[in-house]
Amino acid sequence: MNMLMALLVNITLSTLLIIVAFWLPQLNLYTEKANPYECGFDPMGSARLPFSMKFFLVAITFLLFDLEIALLLPLPWAIQMYNINIMMLTAFILVSVLALGLAYEWVQKGLEWTE
C-alpha cells in the first residue's frame, strides 16, 4: 500500500511538473530571446553559420572511441571473476575492434584535418 501511494505521488508530481514546464514558456513570449548574443551590438551577419563537416566527423569518431574505452573501465573489477579467460578474451576482442577502427580511420584519412 505504501509503495502504491509513493508511486501515485511520484507520477502525479512528475506529470504536474511536465505540464508546468510546457505551459510556463508560452506565457512570456519575448522575441529578443531568439536573437544571438552579440555583447550589446547588432549582429554583423548570421549567427547560424554552418560548421565544418570534418569537425563533426572527428567529434563523432572521438565519441565512439571514448565509448569503447568506457567499456573497458570495469576491467579491474572483472579480474576478480572465477573464469578469467573469458574476461580477457572479451577485453582482447574489444581492444582489437578499437584498434581496427582506428586503423580504418587512419587509412580513410578521417583523422587528417587538412585536405
UniProtKB/Swiss-Prot annotation:
Gene Ontology BP term (one): mitochondrial electron transport, NADH to ubiquinone
Q: Which InterPro entries match?
A: NADH_UbQ/plastoQ_OxRdtase_su3, NDAH_ubi_oxred_su3_sf
Claim: Transmembrane is one of the keywords in the record: yes
What are its GO cellular component terms?
mitochondrial inner membrane; NADH dehydrogenase complex
Per the UniProt entry, the Enzyme Commission number(s) are 7.1.1.2
Q: Which residues cross the membrane?
A: 4-24, 55-75, 84-104
Q: What is its main location?
A: mitochondrion
What keywords is this UniProt entry annotated with? Electron transport, Membrane, Mitochondrion, Mitochondrion inner membrane, NAD, Respiratory chain, Translocase, Transmembrane, Transmembrane helix, Transport, Ubiquinone
User: Which PANTHER family is this protein grouped with?
Assistant: NADH-UBIQUINONE OXIDOREDUCTASE CHAIN 3
What family is it from?
Belongs to the complex I subunit 3 family.
Q: How does it assemble?
A: Core subunit of respiratory chain NADH dehydrogenase (Complex I) which is composed of 45 different subunits. Interacts with TMEM186. Interacts with TMEM242.
The identity of this protein, by name, is: NADH-ubiquinone oxidoreductase chain 3
Q: Which organism is it from?
A: Peromyscus melanotis (Black-eared mouse)
